[in-house]
Curated annotation (Swiss-Prot):
It comes from Gallus gallus (Chicken). Tyrosine phosphatase which dephosphorylates or contributes to the dephosphorylation of several substrates. Plays a role in cell adhesion, migration, proliferation and differentiation. Has a role in megakaryocytes and platelet formation. May influence the potential of nonsensory supporting cells to either proliferate or differentiate into hair cells. This is Receptor-type tyrosine-protein phosphatase eta. InterPro entries: FN3_dom, FN3_sf, Ig-like_fold, Prot-tyrosine_phosphatase-like, PTP_cat, PTPRJ_TM, RTP_Phos/Ushers, Tyr_Pase_AS. Residues 1066-1406 are cytoplasmic. Residues 1110-1367 form the Tyrosine-protein phosphatase domain. GO terms for cellular component: cell-cell junction; plasma membrane; ruffle membrane. Found on the apical surfaces of retinal Mueller cells, renal tubule cells and intestinal brush border cells. It is found in: Cell membrane; Cell projection, Ruffle membrane; Cell junction. GO terms for molecular function: phosphatase activity; protein tyrosine phosphatase activity. The gene is PTPRJ. It is a single-pass type I membrane protein. Residues 39-72 are annotated as: Disordered.
């Protein structure tokens, strides 16, 4: 096929000349139509042309002169320039739109002329603006357009601008297909334009997949090479002679014929439909439609399809049909010859295929068919089992299928077959399982409480796919469950219940069941729960619980197992008692609940228990220690070899357990001194089952006491202290064993201290302290300490000078108790000499000791201390003077001067008095010129002996030192004696000397001078020394006798005075009893000293007539001391410090406080009182007033007081007798003194308090003990003498250890009555012990000289004498020390311990 040449697309220039609104908006393959064409021009040259202005909304039109018409002349104007940019905005069939530009400034006044030239034809158009539409043109014709700008004069035109172009041809007419083939089409058309002879034609062929162009120079064209059955668009364009300017296209669309269909077949033959398919070789087959002619014996109809297949529906099932297919393009008019196919439709599927019967190896099937052609049908039954397929046939609508496998899935498909014997309808299928065979050997492999395990067998070949339904039936329920295997665990059953189990084999469809196999049984009862055993010795009580709903029908079997022995018991209720068992033996009790059948038992619930062992026997302690106890016991049980033993150790709420494998145990880790209850339980071999406990209660031994010390040792007591760290020590008592040689005594204490009394002084004791637990029986190990008591001081100590010897003779009575010797200490100032005495006789015998030589006439303090094993007694002191002896011989001779013819003066210094005071001097005259050596024998010679020539040496004058007048001494202390005066002194005459004789003088000095009855000096019995003889003095001649006589008289007077003075001096020395010098001038003026052995008769005498004698004595004492001054007490500032106006302290003995800020601050109502051995042994004071408490404590501190004796209650008979001056609990400050009560022991008759007293300024402190006697009424006396004597002993024992300068402070209310009685008792007891004499009167007198009203009442005075009487009587009864007989009071007090601040005083424990 020849293809015409294609025309070029629309020229680009043409497009640019067109206005924007009329440009082709697509490629020039479609219509290039022009818009705004106002008129389509004809081809006649006579048509009127018009010019339309396309800008400014103005339309200009004018008649145009015929071509060649001349223009009239105008005024000459400037020629416009040629227009620029002349172009076509639009080219149409009969019109053209032109545009141009003008750059002239006068262009606004321009008009424009457009010259239109076509060959020889010229037309003119005008325009006021720069564009113009030229209409009335001839289609497809060449035109030249020249535009001239014309000035405002309308005549002057510029150069013309030209453009040449063809108008578009007119579209072709009557375009049609003369022939349409499978791959080609013949087109024809017509054209009416006058210029058509010069036209060529472009045919544009467009399909969905391509665009082609071809050309033709005539008005027809054959288009070849097309695709069959394809829709094509054919568009024909007339093209002007320039081969560029095209007319608008004329179009026609059509299909090429399809290719014939091929390979027609039925893809699917259905019951009422057939699916046909075919092929077509044309490439445009997707655009085909197909007509299918459907023909059967009675009818014809057509179906169409847009694709190469179709489903023909609405057919009659099982009927013969002829199907013919025609391919038809989209226009449904072009067809080729059809292709035919003959076939039967399928019969309809059979309906309601059901099984009338399903058996183990056969199935009966039935079905229905509704087709009108069904009478000609036969039926094929396909029997499928897995991959095995068998076919059965039937001419009717039912069939029995036999020879099947049990329990197997079969699919039975029934096909209706048409009359051709081949075309079968869709199969109607039914799938089912044949029944499985019934299960075999159904049995219960396991019967549980809530479950049963069933097993069975199945011999079917399909049994692997079986499941099994187990129907479980009881009286109250029916349940089903399934199993995939030939066994099943049936759970959730009710214990102890009868169940029927039916097992059905179920085919794999889970529906088809075999006939059931049946078994019946009881589930096991639930094991009993909460099985408990009450242990007995030979029986066990069991009880249990069963929660099963069927438990009312249960019985119970109890299996009793002991080793290899098994017994069974039964019970109808959930409890039982098993008897006849062995003690302490392991039994396993297994309880089985038995269902109502009497055979089905639940699992046994077991409990293994031991019977209780019998209680242990003979529990006892083999040993009780501090932290351990050894227990033993016996057990008679036959199984006791396997027993262990639990020992429960109970201590209050604390319980611990110990174990033992044998019948004894050591329990350790106990607390000392603690009550424990030990309960021993025999425990069976299980380690848990215990028999009844056997108990024993006991205390562990307390620990041995620690730090046992003798804190305070006296003659008859030892204060023991110790510590106990035991937790239970608060409940302990303590036994103190006091051992001396073979004698052992005991005492008890409730605290960790004890004062052991009634000891023998100076004796070694072994003190063993045993802590005793609260049972008062269990003792700890004793802690021992050996301690010697302080030995007793010697009694009746006397110190005597030995005449004319320098040593002293000491005498004392051997003390009570033991001792190893005596230390004798002799000291004078800083000089001290110590000696020892080792021996003493029996108690009370006198010991005499001679000291080593001392200085003559020296006052020594001699102290005798009893020594015993390093301890010493309180020293007994005496102040003694050694004897006087001859005075030392003077170094110088006397100075002798002649006074007259018969007298001379002898001047000599005093002899040294170191060997005794000089008592007298004897002036001796020696008449021999040579050999002046006076001797004691010369003292016997007198002046008369000299005159009688019996001696050359004589005593001329004796001077009594005490009688020397002041005139007898010169101012330089020398003595001057005038010899020869003729006076007489004692038995010596101071006779005149012989004138003109020579004399020498010597002076004899006497420390002791004794005279004969004749007043002659006893030389051998006197202590005398002689001075060297003086130089010889010669007397002058005698001036007269008268002078000698005068001197003799004077000497005689002097002798008398000397003798009188000497006698007075001797008497005074004899009367003086106490060598101590009082601190005051008070001297005892009266006393009634009575020996102890005479006191009883004296007492009875004074006691007669209602104590008349004592009353007289007491009356005599009333005036004692009352005239002594009390100025300080009477000062106005001090009156408020006195409790009573009639009890004021004497100035001479009052206690003065130190550091007074004013003169009255030193005052306190208190006096120093003499004791037996010290003038300041006591301070007697009134009870403090509120305003004097600070002064009271200030006195205690300043006077170094360690002991206070309080003899009154604070309030008596509703009257305040004394302020409470001590704190109860907290420390309290009294001025600068801080007082803290350390301890308080309250006893029936007295209270003992210890205070710590501290000076806030110096921070020094010491302890003060207060002895508060509470059983002495004011102005009265205690009930018994023993009570006061014992109390005095208590105070004395303590205070004897105080510092030696520490007085005892005694007070009651006024500080006179009870206070005086107590001080007097102390002095009298010591006087009895030391002197074996009694002076009650003298003691009271002495006290009253120091403080008024001491021993205030007659009753108190009589009471003092009664005390003395009782003391003496007790001595006679061999109770040597009454003070040791306080069996009641001291037993109470013996555990009281001094406060912690007590240390040592003077080497003794305090």
């Amino acid at each position: 096929m020849r293809r015409l040449p294609l025309l070029p697309p629309c020229p680009l220039l043409l497009l640019l000349l067109l206005p924007a609104e009329v440009r082709c908006t697509t490629a020039c393959t479609d219509d290039c139509s022009l818009k705004n064409v106002t008129e389509e021009m004809g081809t006649s040259s006579n048509d009127e042309l018009s010019v339309n202005a396309t800008s400014g909304n103005r339309r200009l039109s004018e008649d145009v002169s015929l071509p060649g018409r001349a223009m009239s002349d105008q005024n000459s104007v400037a020629q416009p320039r040629a227009v620029l940019d002349l172009k076509t905005e639009y080219v149409g069939v009969t019109s053209v739109n032109l545009t141009w530009t003008v750059n002239d400034t006068a262009s606004d006044s321009y008009t424009y002329r457009i010259e239109v030239r076509n060959g020889s034809s010229i037309n003119n158009k005008t325009s006021d603006i720069t564009d113009a539409e030229i209409t009335g043109l001839i289609p497809g014709t060449l035109y030249t357009f020249t535009v001239f700008a014309v000035a405002a004069d309308g005549q002057t035109a510029g150069e013309g601008a030209s453009i040449s172009l063809y108008t578009k041809p007119s579209p072709v007419l009557d375009l049609k297909a003369e022939y349409v083939g499978v791959t080609s089409v013949n087109l024809t058309w017509t054209v009416n334009d006058t210029a058509s002879a010069s036209y060529t034609y472009r045919i544009e062929v467009t399909s969905d997949s391509s665009i082609d162009s071809l050309t033709s120079s005539v008005t027809m064209a054959e288009i070849t090479g097309l695709i069959p059955g394809t829709l094509y668009s054919f568009k024909v364009f007339a093209v002007a002679a320039d081969n560029r300017t095209e007319a608008d296209g004329a179009s026609i669309s059509l299909y090429t014929k399809p290719s014939p269909v091929l390979d027609l077949k039925a893809e699917y033959v259905g019951v009422t439909s057939v699916n046909l398919t075919w092929t077509v070789n044309g490439t445009a087959l997707t655009a085909y439609t197909y007509r299918i002619e459907v023909r059967n014996a009675t009818s014809i109809r057509n179906e169409t399809s847009n694709i190469n297949k179709i489903e023909i529906t609405g057919l009659i099932p099982g009927t013969s049909y002829n199907f013919k297919v025609f391919a038809t393009p989209v226009n449904n008019t072009t067809e080729e010859e059809g292709l035919s196919l003959n076939l039967y439709t399928k019969p309809s599927p059979v309906l309601r295929v059901v099984t009338e019967y399903v058996g183990v190896t056969s199935v009966n099937l039935t079905w229905m068919v509704d087709d009108t052609a069904s009478d000609s049908y036969t039926y094929r039954i396909e029997v499928r089992n897995g991959s095995s397929i068998n076919n059965k046939t039937s001419d009717i609508t039912d069939a029995e299928i036999t020879g099947l496998i049990p329990g197997t899935l079969y699919t039975f498909t029934v096909f209706a077959v048409a009359a051709d014997g081949q075309t079968a309808g869709e199969g109607a299928s039914i799938s089912l399982y044949t029944k499985p065979s019934p299960v075999l050997d159904l049995k219960a492999e396991y019967v549980g409480v809530t479950s049963v395990n069933l097993t069975w067998t199945v011999n079917d070949t399909a049994s692997a796919s079986y499941t099994y339904r187990i129907e479980v039936t009881s009286d109250s329920s029916i349940d089903s469950l399934t199993s995939n295997v030939t066994m099943a665990e049936i759970t959730g059953l009710i214990p102890g219940t009868l169940y029927n189990f039916t097992v059905f084999a179920v085919a794999a469809d889970n529906r088809t069941e075999a006939d059931g196999a049946f078994t019946s049984l009881y589930t096991k009862p639930t094991p009993v729960t909460d099985l408990k055993a009450e242990h007995g010795v030979t029986s066990v009580s069991l009880n249990w619980m069963v929660n099963d709903t069927a438990s009312d029908s249960y019985t119970y079997r109890i299996e009793v197992r002991n080793g290899h022995s098994v017994n069974n018991k039964t019970s109808n209720i959930p409890e039982t008692e098993i008897t006849g068992l062995n003690p302490g033996t392991l039994y396993t009790f297994t309880v089985f609940a038995v269902a109502a059948d009497g055979e089905t038992e639940g699992e046994g619930a077991s409990i293994s228990v031991y019977t209780k062992p019998r209680a242990v026997l003979h529990l006892k302690t083999e040993y009780v220690g501090v932290t351990s106890v050894n227990l033993t016991w016996t057990v008679n049980d036959t199984d006791s070899a396997s027993y262990t033993y639990r020992i429960e150790v109970r201590n209050g709420s604390s319980i611990n357990n110990k174990t033992s494998d044998i019948t004894d145990a050591e329990i350790t880790g106990l607390d000392p001194g603690t009550l424990y209850i030990f309960t021993v339980f025999a425990v069976a071999a299980d380690g848990q089952t215990a028999g009844e406990g056997a108990s024993i209660s006991l205390y562990t031994k307390p620990s041995m006491v620690l730090n046992l010390k003798a804190e305070y040792v006296t003659m008859t007591s030892v204060n023991l202290t110790w510590m106990v760290n035991d937790a239970e020590s608060a409940s302990y008592t303590y036994r103190i064993e006091v051992a001396h040689e073979s004698l052992i005594n005991e005492t008890m204490s409730n605290v960790t201290k004890s004062i052991v009394t009634y000891l023998i002084p100076g004796t070694s004791y072994n003190f063993t302290v045993f802590a005793i637990a609260a049972d008062n029986q269990t003792e700890g190990e004793g802690a021992s300490i050996s301690q010697n008591t302080v030995p007793s001081s010697v009694n009746a100590f006397q110190c005597e000078a030995v005449a004319n010897m320098s040593y002293l003779t000491l005498k004392w009575n051997c003390p009570y108790g033991g001792y190893s010797g005596f230390d004798i200490e002799i000291f004078n100032g800083t000089w001290t000499k110590k000696q020892q005495s080792q021996f003493c006789g029996r108690e009370g015998s006198e010991e005499i000791f001679k000291t080593e030589p001392l200085d003559y006439y020296k006052t020594y303090t001699v102290s005798v201390t009893t020594v015993s094993d390093g301890l010493t007694s309180l020293p007994v002191q005496k102040i003694c003077k050694t004897s006087i002896t001859d005075p030392p011989v003077p170094n110088k001779a006397p100075l002798v001067k002649a006074v007259s013819h018969n007298s001379l003066s002898v001047e000599f210094p005093d002899f040294e008095s170191v060997n005794g005071p000089l008592k007298a001097y004897a002036v001796m005259i020696v008449t021999e010129a040579e050999g002046c050596l006076p001797s004691k024998s010369d003292l016997d010679y007198t002046y008369n002996d000299f005159k009688q020539k019996m001696t050359a040496t004589y005593v001329t004058y004796v001077i009594d030192v005490e009688e020397i007048s002041s005139s007898s001494h010169s101012q330089n202390g020398h003595n001057i004696v005038d010899v020869g005066k003729g006076n007489t002194m004692y038995g010596y005459e101071n006779g005149p000397l012989i004138p003109l004789h020579s004399y020498r003088a010597s002076v004899a000095g006497f420390t002791n001078i004794n005279f004969t009855v004749a007043n002659k000096i006893m030389g051998e019995q006197s202590y005398v020394s002689f001075s060297p003889c003086s130089e010889v003095v010669s007397l002058p001649q005698d001036p007269g006798v008268i002078a000698g006589a005068v001197i003799g008289c004077l000497l005689a007077i002097l002798a008398v005075v000397a003798i009188g003075g000497y006698i007075f001096w001797r008497r005074r020395r004899k009367d003086k009893r106490n060598t101590e010098v009082s601190f005051s001038p008070i001297k005892i003026k009266k006393s009634k000293m009575i020996k102890v052995e005479n006191f009883e008769s004296y007492f009875k005498k004074q006691q007669a007539d209602s104590n008349c004698g004592f009353a007289e004595e007491y009356e005599e004492l009333k005036s004692a001391g009352v005239h002594q001054p009390k100025f300080a007490a009477e000062i106005a500032e001090n009156r408020g410090k006195n409790r009573y106006n009639n009890v004021l302290p004497y100035d001479i003995s009052r206690v003065k406080l130190s550091n007074p800020s004013c003169t009255t601050d030193d005052y306190i109502n208190a006096n120093y009182m003499p004791g037996y051995s010290s003038k300041k042994a006591f301070i007697a004071a009134q009870g403090p007033l509120p305003n004097t408490i600070e002064d009271f404590w200030r006195m205690i501190w300043e006077k170094n007081i360690y002991s206070i004796v309080m003899l009154t209650k604070c309030v008596e008979q509703a009257r305040t007798k004394c302020e409470q001056y001590w704190p109860d609990k907290q420390s309290k400050s009294y001025g600068d003194i801080i007082v803290t009560m350390v301890s308080e022991v309250v006893l029936p008759e007295w209270t003992i308090r210890d205070f710590n007293v501290e000076n806030a300024d110096t921070m020094e402190s010491h302890t003060v003990r207060q002895f508060h006697f509470t059983s002495w009424p004011d102005h009265g006396v205690p009930e018994t003498t023993d009570l006061l004597i014992n109390f005095r002993h208590l105070v004395h024992e303590y205070s004897s250890q105080n510092p030696i300068d520490s007085p005892i402070l005694v007070h009651c209310s006024a500080g006179v009555g009870r206070t005086g009685t107590f001080i007097a008792i102390d002095r009298l007891i010591q006087q009895i012990e030391m002197e074996n004499t009694v002076d009650v009167y003298g003691v009271v007198y002495d006290l009253r000289m120091h403080r008024p009203l001491m021993v205030q009442t007659e009753d108190q005075y009589v009471f003092l004498n009664q005390c003395v009487m009782d003391i003496i009587r007790s001595q006679k009864e061999k109770k040597t020390d009454l003070i040791y007989q306080n069996t009641t009071a001291m037993a109470i007090y013996e555990n009281f311990t001094p406060g912690p601040a007590f240390g040592k005083a003077n080497g003794y424990h305090a």
